[in-house]
């Protein structure tokens, strides 16, 4: 395959070129308390899980702390533990509901590493299936 064509991500790509971004979505959306509208599917003590509005694959989740931090070192041990437990919870739920063959799980630390929102750390949990021909940078 020469090119990945994911037209549902075009809105995200065009927004990413706009240097003026409003408030961090990982701060604003949980405060709004409208979880269904904001695609938040689970809340923990220190972290929450939401569907990615611009997914790489069906079921693409993001697990983020409520704290606005850019690096793992900035999280307290309890927050870091809750973050990893949130990732485990996400894979468990996706496994029961969507039955993927595997997952891509990762963090893009910094804009150079591909972070679209470099100021707020978050894990991507992307379910994968044999032959899905998808890609996660």
What does each model-identified segment do?
Residues 1-137:
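HIT superfamily nucleotide-processing domains
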């Amino acid at each position: 395959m020469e090119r990945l064509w994911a037209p549902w991500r075009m809105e995200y790509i065009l927004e990413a070129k706009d240097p003026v971004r409003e408030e961090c979505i990982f701060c604003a959306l949980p405060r709004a308390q409208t979880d269904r509208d904001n695609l938040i599917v689970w809340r923990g003590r220190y972290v929450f899980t939401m569907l990615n509005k611009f997914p790489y694959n069906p079921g693409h989740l993001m697990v983020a702390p409520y704290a606005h931090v850019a690096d793992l070192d900035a999280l307290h041990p309890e927050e870091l533990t809750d973050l990893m437990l949130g990732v485990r919870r996400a894979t468990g739920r996706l496994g029961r509901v969507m039955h993927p063959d595997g997952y891509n799980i990762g963090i893009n630390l910094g804009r150079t590493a591909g972070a679209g929102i470099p100021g707020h750390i978050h894990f991507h949990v992307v379910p994968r299936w044999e032959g899905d021909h998808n890609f996660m940078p």
